[in-house]
């Protein structure tokens, strides 16, 4: 349970970090306004889905929420790469890109564990 709480907190902090850089992303040009919006949606969805999963009715439902959170984490990584390609500060983006990758790895492991039948 402790690891899940850590995962949820890290996902929350990831969302906060992305929300902090959203104005900078919008400032890259008018074509980046929708990118900032998509990045913000994807990054905050990771934590929201994990919160939903924490109260899942079943192990299968929790695995489903974690799979969706994984998709959102990977989408966030994509948008961050796109912003970096436009020349945004690596100093700002690198920690968020790293965290998106680490969250993806943690979520992949979590989904695998949740899909493994429990031994009674």
Language-model segments: residues:
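Short, C-terminally biased terminal segments at protein or domain edges
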Residues: 1-120
């Amino acid at each position: 349970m402790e690891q899940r709480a850590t995962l949820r907190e890290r996902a929350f902090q990831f969302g906060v970090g992305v929300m902090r850089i959203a104005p900078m992303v919008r400032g890259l040009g008018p074509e980046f306004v929708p990118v900032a919006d998509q990045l913000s949606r994807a990054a905050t969805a990771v934590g929201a889905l994990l919160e939903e999963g924490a109260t899942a009715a079943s192990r299968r439902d929790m695995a489903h929420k974690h799979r969706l959170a994984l998709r959102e984490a990977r989408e966030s990584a994509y948008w961050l790469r796109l912003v970096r390609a436009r020349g945004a500060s690596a100093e700002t983006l690198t920690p968020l890109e790293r965290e998106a990758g680490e969250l993806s790895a943690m979520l992949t492991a979590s989904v695998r564990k949740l899909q493994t039948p429990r031994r009674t």
